[in-house]
């Protein structure tokens, strides 16, 4: 094994160039992801459907493209949200929207009741979601004490397109961590052993 690596160790300039090419590929992928995040106004502009709660609209493993530049979300629109305190994207349909009425009791962060809404807090829309394949709405999935989603705080983006089954690769990699190590090791070896 080490004897097969000796030609690469003999020419450090070529080895350095190959490592630099690998770093260039990684940094380009990172820059494309960040550029797409800025363009869509979403921290995660592409997500994979992880469960069957949205069948038949989306299957497990479908790759979704998100857009988060619309100020409002309509009933019937499919959104991706994160539960407060957890970083698990959930893909469900908006079933109902709630207007933010001034003078009503509001639940603020920390669960404090009885604080009136200020005019600046009226800008964020409140949403209730449900999976197409679920029997009830998502109030059980929300954080403790949360009865609805806040458009600005909880929504990652609205679904604007999808590619079926492409995301199944990421599901396999997350369900089998050893597969991720094997794949990364194989890719690293291919870059190092590649001849120009």
UniProtKB/Swiss-Prot annotation:
Catalysis performed (reactions): Cleavage of hydrophobic, N-terminal signal or leader sequences from secreted and periplasmic proteins
Positions of the catalytic residues: 53 (charge relay system), 92 (charge relay system), 138 (charge relay system)
Cytoplasmic side: 1-14
One annotated Gene Ontology cellular component of this protein: signal peptidase complex
Record-given protein name: Signal peptidase complex catalytic subunit SEC11
Top EC category: hydrolase
Residues on Lumenal side: 34-196
Membrane topology qualifier: Single-pass type II membrane protein
Source organism: Ajellomyces dermatitidis (strain ER-3 / ATCC MYA-2586)
InterPro entries named in the record: LexA/Signal_pep-like_sf, Pept_S26A_signal_pept_1_Ser-AS, Peptidase_S26, Peptidase_S26B
Gene Ontology biological process: protein targeting to ER; signal peptide processing
Record's function text: Catalytic component of the signal peptidase complex (SPC) which catalyzes the cleavage of N-terminal signal sequences from nascent proteins as they are translocated into the lumen of the endoplasmic reticulum. Specifically cleaves N-terminal signal peptides that contain a hydrophobic alpha-helix (h-region) shorter than 18-20 amino acids.
Family: Belongs to the peptidase S26B family.
Oligomer status and interactors: Component of the signal peptidase complex (SPC) composed of a catalytic subunit SEC11 and three accessory subunits SPC1, SPC2 and SPC3. The complex induces a local thinning of the ER membrane which is used to measure the length of the signal peptide (SP) h-region of protein substrates. This ensures the selectivity of the complex towards h-regions shorter than 18-20 amino acids. SPC associates with the translocon complex.
Biased composition (Polar residues): 118-133
């Amino acid at each position: 094994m080490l004897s097969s690596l000796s030609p690469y160790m003999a020419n450090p300039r070529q080895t350095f160039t190959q490592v630099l090419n690998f770093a260039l590929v990684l940094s380009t992928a990172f820059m494309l992801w960040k550029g797409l995040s800025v363009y869509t106004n979403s921290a995660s502009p592409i997500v994979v459907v992880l469960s069957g709660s949205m069948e038949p609209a989306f299957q497990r493993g479908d790759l979704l493209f998100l857009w988060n530049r619309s100020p409002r979300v309509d009933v019937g629109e499919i959104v991706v949200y994160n539960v407060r305190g957890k970083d698990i994207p959930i893909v469900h349909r908006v079933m109902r929207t709630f207007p933010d009425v001034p003078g009503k009791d509001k639940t603020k962060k920390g669960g404090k009741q009885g604080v009136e809404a200020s005019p600046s807090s009226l800008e964020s829309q409140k949403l209730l979601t449900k999976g197409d394949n679920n029997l009830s709405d998502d109030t059980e999935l929300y954080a403790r004490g949360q009865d609805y989603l806040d458009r600005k705080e909880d929504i990652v983006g609205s679904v604007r397109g999808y590619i079926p089954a492409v995301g199944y690769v990421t599901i396999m990699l997350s369900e089998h961590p050893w597969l991720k190590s094997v794949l990364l090791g194989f890719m690293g070896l291919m870059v190092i052993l590649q001849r120009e």
